[in-house]
From Swiss-Prot:
Matches recorded under InterPro entries: EF-4, EFG_II, EFG_III/V, EFG_V-like, EFTu-like_2, G_TR_CS, LepA_C_sf, LepA_CTD
UniProt name for this protein: Elongation factor 4
Organism: Streptococcus pyogenes serotype M1
GO biological process: positive regulation of translation
Name of the coding gene: lepA
Compartments (UniProt record): Cell membrane
Membrane topology: Peripheral membrane protein
Pfam families: EFG_C, EFG_III, GTP_EFTU, GTP_EFTU_D2, LepA_C
Family indicated by similarity: Belongs to the TRAFAC class translation factor GTPase superfamily. Classic translation factor GTPase family. LepA subfamily.
């Protein structure tokens, strides 16, 4: 094709993604669009087709983004090339969403006709507006008995400020309104800008590892053209590779002769090392490089840290390889080696949030067959020492000695909680118990309220989300952004077993709640740790001060069983001998700590402050 033909083809390309809150019907709508454009035959069709990970189907959530090419013949008789880029809806995967939106010109905003706008919808709409996307509102699930499309239309206009007069009323499940959506994409989403004759600039928005072909890049071509045989160069590190294959996904990979400006597809170039390709990097041609890299993504910093250790210590290298492979297409996962006296060798990993941590743990156990122990999650604290230094600490066992600490700052988040009016009291009570500060409250409509609080991230990491769902019968939706660091009265609590500190059980706690949290953990551990041949004291300590203690009683063998009557001094002698043996055993005996003990630091069900 000459450049004139390519420019004509470019005018027919439409790149868009679908954004929605969890369960508002995003994956179902994607399925219908694939059926309507006959991209997938009815034989191959299955629910949530784009959610290819088992985990995604089971949990009914989208974790990874996917990019698919479809052909659509519009009412004007022209055939258009659509690239549908599927995005996750959950707060922990906002990074994935921002990546997929950077590869688009338009976004379909799906809102449930019964539930209306949720906190997550807002967060993703703001991301789309930041990327200057054309937003097409779609009110989905209009066939539900509780649907109220007009109310939702007003919500979209009032809360988000979008013109919803032409919003498509649809039901993805019943296939209503799908054609209107496709026509709106043709009319309203702009064709990609960019120059096919300019030097190649392609944005990497994802990558997968293939055992035979190496790292396969998923790219959006912004300028120029790429074809097999080209020598490409990464703009961040200057490394060069020879392109062996380019193509598109329909969801299956299909090879093509070239990828030109506006296309979304994959590039294979025998890239062997995972570290050479960063998501957000720009690919260009080695013999005709672009002047500057594209504006990539904002690097997401992990907000939650936890230790991951293999239960079998010989699996340490397997765990490292598994983490490297996951990091390849999950750029927000960070890890570094760490050792613990209690757990041996493992990694300190950084995650975007608790769901992200859960998903990574499940993927490690499922896809790589590694049994893991996870320590309690913690956040990044700023510890200011008496020497006027500031240390960032994400691992409680690295906290400096209390005598060296001048003050500690902890991260606060701005939490947006959308909730029906009847539960506002419960939400405010929960937020206050979690040391939250009330900011403001807006009414979205007669019944729904948007409550905003500043809450310490450490409190959200624990079990805030579960508690929020249970106290609002599942009606609340929740989204948070990092806000600032604030000074707090925090202390490090150590747990001692038999007089020895167990580093993996240490945690940071607010001074006010230290005593009760210590008491609960000590009691919990007493139930979990099996009885030994000798008595084991469990203590919770802040610095040198013991704040709570409980003892696991020893198992006792009856050494007097063989004495039938007889002299009391004989019995005493046997008991003294047993006592001496226990004493010796206690001095050298170590206590086995089961996996549940590490998790008990996490779940504080019977905690009064929770």
């Amino acid at each position: 094709m000459n450049s004139q033909d390519l420019k004509k083809r470019q005018e027919k390309i439409r790149n868009f993604s679908i954004i929605a809150h969890i369960d508002h019907g995003k994956s179902t709508l994607a399925d219908r669009i694939l059926e309507k454009t006959e991209t997938v035959s009815s034989r191959e069709m299955q629910a949530q087709l784009l959610d290819s990970m088992d985990l995604e189907r089971e949990r009914g959530i989208t974790i990874k983004l996917n990019a698919i090419e479809l052909n659509y013949t519009a009412k004007d008789g022209e055939t258009y090339i659509f690239h549908l880029i599927d995005t996750p809806g959950h707060v922990d995967f906002t990074y994935e969403v921002s990546r997929s939106l950077a590869a688009c010109e338009g976004a379909i905003l799906v809102v449930d006709a019964a539930q209306g706008i949720e906190a997550q919808t807002l967060a993703n709409v703001y991301l789309a507006l930041d990327n200057d996307l054309e937003i097409l509102p779609v009110i989905n699930k209009i066939d539900l008995p509780a649907a109220d499309p007009e109310r939702v239309r007003h919500e979209v206009e009032d809360v988000i400020g979008l013109d919803a007069s032409e919003a498509v009323l649809a039901s993805a499940k019943a296939g209503i309104g799908i054609e209107e959506i496709l026509e709106q994409i043709v009319e309203k989403v702009p064709a990609p800008t960019g120059d096919v004759d300019a030097p190649l600039q392609a944005l990497i928005f994802d990558s997968v590892y293939d055992a035979y072909r190496g790292v396969i890049l998923q790219v959006r071509i912004v300028n120029g053209i790429v074809k097999p045989g080209d020598k490409i160069q990464m703009m961040s590190n200057g490394k060069t590779f020879d392109v062996t294959e380019v193509g598109i996904f329909t969801p299956k990979a299909v090879g093509r002769d070239f990828l030109a400006t506006g296309d979304v597809g994959y590039v294979a170039a025998s890239i062997k090392t995972v570290a050479d390709t960063r998501v957000g990097d720009t690919v260009t041609l080695a013999n005709n490089p672009a002047k500057e890299a594209l504006h990539g993504y904002k690097q997401m910093n992990p907000m939650v840290f936890a230790g991951i250790y293999p239960i079998e210590s010989n699996k340490y290298n397997d765990l490292r390889e598994a983490l490297e492979k996951l990091q390849l297409n999950d750029a927000s996962l960070q890890f570094e080696p760490e050792t613990s006296q209690a757990l041996g060798f493992g990694f300190r990993c950084g995650f975007l949030g608790l769901l992200h941590m859960d998903v990574i743990q499940e993927r490690l156990e499922r896809e790589f067959n590694i049994d893991l122990i996870m320590t309690a999650p913690s956040v990044v604290y700023h510890v200011h020492t008496t020497d006027e230094d500031m240390i960032e600490v994400s691992n409680p066992s690295e906290f400096p000695d209390p005598t060296r600490v001048a003050f500690i700052e902890e991260p606060y988040v701005k939490a947006q909680i959308m909730v029906p009016q009847e539960f506002v009291g419960a939400v405010m009570e929960l937020s206050q118990r979690k040391r939250g500060d009330f900011v403001t409250m807006d009414y979205i409509d007669d019944n729904r309220v948007n409550v905003i609080y500043q809450i310490p991230l450490a409190e959200i990491v624990f079990d805030f989300f579960d508690k929020l769902k249970s106290s609002t019968r599942g009606y609340a939706s929740f989204d948070y952004d990092m806000s600032e660091y604030r000074r707090s009265q925090l202390v490090k609590m150590d747990i001692l077993l038999n007089g020895d500190k167990v580093d993996a059980l240490s945690f940071i706690v607010h001074k006010e709640f230290a005593y009760e949290r210590g008491k609960i953990i000590v009691e919990k551990l007493k139930k979990i740790i099996p009885r030994q041949q000798f008595e084991v004291p469990i203590q919770a300590a802040i610095g040198q001060k013991i704040v709570a203690r409980s003892d696991i009683k020893a198992l006792r063998k009856n050494v007097l069983a063989k004495c039938y009557g007889g002299d009391v001094s004989r019995k005493r002698k046997l008991l003294e001998k047993q006592k001496a043996g226990k004493k010796r055993m206690k001095a050298i005996g170590s206590v086995e700590v089961p996996q549940e003990a590490f998790l008990s630091v996490l779940s504080m069900d019977d905690d009064t402050k929770k």
